[in-house]
């Protein structure tokens, strides 16, 4: 087939779509025997070289390149046919170990073999050895091109090594010279960090571990770690389980709830207490009361004092703040004085719930336990309240964290208390509820007539270490009472001329009291 126009060379140098200088159309495709004879006769007479003159001198419709390739690969007299011998194969392996893929230079070392034959042999051998998993070179032959790589490849490898080393140095500088302020202010999905108590154990604290590996640590989990990085840089901190806290506090841990230190020290098991905020409507604080079932001991009321939510009160201090829903005339500073009266023999405290008196220690329980000191001559269940300004009744809802009853029973009293606990609790609850109504009526009655309101004070006494057999030695006894402007104690029983029987509460007398003061209020 003869085609006009330029084209590439075909097999054995046969040109395609090509015209000679004289305008002769050149052939392409396989050579014929007549063409081989014309080419062989011309080379025997004129020798090898000047292949473009073959077409001019012989009229052969082949280009010079096609004539050269046909003579070198098929027509020359010293050409070897067939497969390679063992010596030739070993020589090819040695030459390839020294020269690499230099097929023409290898063919010059093998007389009678062409570069195309050597290339085909090596590629076939390479595929077979890779498929079988055998080494490419025998043990006695070491590739020279691997020991002495090409200068261009060596420079490229050195450039890649220096670039990788420079990236590592930048990562180290970002990690070790990053300001601490940026690490502390880095946002995260965990709560605000707060230090964990030093004596907290792994089973008694509920903490989350703050990890921002992608922000604080330059080596993120998605970045491949080289051996140099693994040896020179510390690994990123792992995520700790929410049920345990890390032993080494190198990174800030975040407690989910600010528990008191006493609870953390005492609770060594895995039980966790989650304090909940109290509901909006709660019964009066003096409703939670218990009494001793003893003939010589009056009703013992344990008054619950509420504080601001999640603001613990120091257990070792004898002064505290009270935030309860009853107004006081003015906010005064805390004073300590002793009132000599027949109703109380313990020192009294006048407390001020100022903002500066809020404690900040987190190592003490978050509620104050006020224990009533029984007396044979008087009975006081009036708690002491103090506020800076008056509030509406709808806003006077106490926020109570919790309460705790501190009772020092003897063996006989404990048995009597267990027998009469159900009935006495119901009666004392009703008594306390009516007492609160009675106090509110008294406050309204005194305020309407222009009488000065009574200043409520807290009377506290130091604990008696001789008679105290309980473990709660740190608590102190508190008795509540009313003090007017002249510091005279006004007892509730003195106003109504009513005495309480310690063995049986007179419920009807409390109803009469309530009705009397309700009538006074209406007047």
From Swiss-Prot:
Residues 140-254, 332-373, 396-426, 444-470 are annotated as: Disordered. GO terms for cellular component: nucleus; pollen tube. Gene3D superfamilies: Homeodomain-like. The keyword Transcription applies. Signal peptide: none annotated. Residues 202-212, 223-232, 341-368 have a biased composition (Low complexity). It is found in: Nucleus. One of its GO terms (biological process) is pollen tube growth. One of its GO terms (molecular function) is DNA-binding transcription factor activity. Induction: Accumulates in pollen tube 4 hours after pollen germination. Expressed in pollen grains and pollen tube. Mostly expressed in mature pollen grains, and, to a lower extent, in inflorescences and siliques. Residues 147-167 have a biased composition (Basic residues). Disruption phenotype: Disrupted pollen tube growth. The triple mutant myb97 myb101 myb120 is impaired in pollen tube growth arrest and subsequent sperm cell release in the female gametophyte thus leading to a drastically reduced fertility. Altered pollen tube-specific gene expression. Residues 23-75, 76-130 form the HTH myb-type domain. Residues 51-75, 103-126 bind DNA. The keyword Repeat applies. This is Transcription factor MYB120. It comes from Arabidopsis thaliana (Mouse-ear cress). The gene is MYB120.
